Curated annotation (Swiss-Prot):
PANTHER family noted in UniProt: ENDORIBONUCLEASE YBEY, CHLOROPLASTIC
Keywords attached to this entry: Cytoplasm, Endonuclease, Hydrolase, Metal-binding, Nuclease, Ribosome biogenesis, rRNA processing, Zinc
Gene name, Swiss-Prot/TrEMBL: ybeY
Single GO BP term: rRNA processing
Localisation per UniProt entry: Cytoplasm
Cofactor note: Binds 1 zinc ion.
Entry-linked InterPro entries: MetalPrtase_cat_dom_sf_prd, YbeY, YbeY_CS
Enzyme class per UniProt: hydrolase
Main localization category: cytoplasm
Name used for this protein in its record: Endoribonuclease YbeY
Length: 153
């Protein structure tokens, strides 16, 4: 089964390195897998200020974060392939990659996969859910040719 993906990538900031549209599409397609035949998704790349504002508004945390996921929930009688939105803070991803001694590409891939899994309903609040989500993330990231994102360097 192949995924018919409509991906809108919004660049609201600049940085030294960003994934290509093709990389974003590969990572989203990998994360979504066989969960759906058709999907629409927006990835918005933002600066620290916008990330902090959104994180404060929607999560009550007054600091920028790496990725925020906003799933779209249509009324039950309406079928739309709209999965939702990911908001990724380029500066946080760059800082985390450096701190964790990962390549930017590997960490961006991880953030996209992580965010997509949230859009699909996965979470990591409870320990059991976290184990399931991290296991799936690791499997998907390794399938993309990167190392386990949770393995200590």
């Amino acid at each position: 089964m192949s995924l018919d993906l409509a991906l809108d990538i919004q660049h609201a900031t600049t940085c030294d390195w960003l994934p290509t549209d093709e990389q974003f599409a590969l990572w989203v397609t990998t994360a979504i897998g066989n969960s759906m035949n058709e999907a629409e998704l927006t990835i918005r790349i933002v600066d620290s200020r916008e990330s902090q504002m959104l994180n404060s508004t929607y999560r009550g945390k007054d600091k920028p974060t790496n990725v925020l996921s906003f799933p779209f929930e249509a009324p039950p009688e309406i079928e739309l392939p709209l999965l939702g939105d990911l908001v990724i803070c380029a500066a946080v991803v760059e800082n985390e990659a450096r701190e964790q001694q990962k390549t930017l590409e590997a960490h961006w891939a991880h953030m996209v996969v992580h965010g997509c899994l949230h859009l699909l309903g996965y979470d990591h609040i409870e320990d059991e859910e976290a184990e399931e989500m991290e296991s799936l993330e690791t499997q998907l990231i390794e399938g993309l040719g990167f190392t386990d994102p949770y393995k200590e360097q």
